Regions:
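Conserved alpha-helical segments that form or flank metal/cofactor-binding pockets of metalloenzymes
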Residues: 32-75
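Basic/polar N-terminal segments that are highly enriched at the extreme N-terminus
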Residues: 1-5
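Acidic/histidine-rich alpha-helical segments that form the ligand environment
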Residues: 7-17, 21-28, 60-61, 79-132
Length: 132
């Protein structure tokens, strides 16, 4: 059975994943060049708000269940695939990076859903809603 500290730890992982996605979406929504990039840039810029909203929900839950929302010194980047490409017209690289980031988030939320089962139904429901 998972402890509250186990749940907080995994919520923090999910929180940082969302925050990193925000940073990379902002960077790529600005940096991409070319006619083919315009729709991707618009989509990424629009998704920043949703991803930041996910991070805020996670942060509130961390605090609610007794954790502390970490500051930037605790951040460890991990989204190699979503970094701005060397060739700023490489839209495909960004699309692949978005897919990789979303796959990682889905995996983390599923991990939390299993971890919370029978222990913390509110956090479990929050994670289920994030996947909806």
């Amino acid at each position: 059975m998972a402890s509250q500290s186990d749940i907080v730890k995994e919520l923090q992982v999910a929180y940082w994943m969302e925050m990193e996605t925000v940073m990379n979406y902002v960077a790529n929504s600005i940096n991409l060049d070319g006619v083919r990039a315009e729709e991707i840039k618009k989509s990424l810029a629009a998704d920043v708000t949703a991803e930041l909203g996910h991070a805020q929900v996670l942060a509130k839950r961390i605090k609610t269940i007794g954790g502390v929302v970490e500051g930037s010194m605790k951040f460890n980047a991990g989204q190699k695939e979503l970094q701005p490409p060397a060739k700023l017209t490489d839209v495909v690289a960004i699309i692949k990076g978005v897919i990789a980031a979303e796959d990682s988030a889905i995996t983390q939320y599923n991990k939390l859903i299993k971890l919370c089962d029978g222990v913390d139904y509110v956090t479990q429901d929050l994670c289920i809603q994030a996947l909806a």
